[in-house]
Amino acid sequence: MLILNHFAFVIRIWSVWLVACAVIVAFSFLRVDVPVALYFWNVDHLRSPLNLAFGSTVILSAEAAVILFTVFARLARGHISVFGETLAVACLVSMCAYVVNDHVLKVLFGVPNPADMVHGAGHTFNFWMGSENSSFPSGHMVLAGAFAGFFMRLYKASIRLFCVLLLIAAGLMLVGDWHFLSDIIAGAFLGTSAGILAGEGWAAHSAR
């Protein structure tokens, strides 16, 4: 009964944040996205080094390496630390959230990315006509948000650190013109929600 009450409370809080996020995303989509994207498109000298250092392939490869290292450590030593276990699961949650976002949500919403918009594509939703190269929601922010959300749920002391890191990541997405502001906000919300939900489940599993 206590668990159900806690879950109901979490859902109510999440619903409030969902409505707030939807309002902010809608405003950004209509009023902010295009001017900001066009402004940063003119500082294209910043995009190349950012693309090289923070491409999704690089991040996914790093997370896969962490998972493999943890598995090998478990096989070699017979056990791993709680932190190591948390790190590996956070990486797995992050990768799963990224796959769902890129292959389901981006296809569903079909918003052209900033580069396509600059070259003539409209900044509109094209439902069920998207691809993994579409823009909404941001895969990078889903990737980072899911990892951060999982950690923040299990290690409350890390909340401030990850909030700062997510803000930095959001800034890099804008400066690099990878995504519109609405993409970033939606991706951060969805990713963090997925991470916190997974963290809730993992905490309940670990408490047994």
What are these regions (language model features)?
Residues 3-16, 122-208:
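Membrane-embedded catalytic cores of phosphoryl/pyrophosphoryl-handling enzymes
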Residues 65-77, 144-152:
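Hydrophobic, aromatic-rich transmembrane alpha-helices
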Residues 27, 33-36, 66, 96, ...:
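Alpha-helical membrane-inserting segments
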Residues 22-29, 94-100, 166-178:
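Aromatic-anchored segments of alpha-helical transmembrane domains
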Residues 5-9, 44-48, 52, 74, ...:
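Membrane-helix interfacial "entry" motifs
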Residues 69-103:
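Interfacial segments of alpha-helical transmembrane regions
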Residues 1-69, 106-128:
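N-terminal transmembrane-helix/juxtamembrane module of multi-pass inner/ER membrane proteins
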Residues 75-79, 107-115, 178, 182, ...:
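Transmembrane helix-loop junctions in multipass membrane proteins, especially transporters and channels
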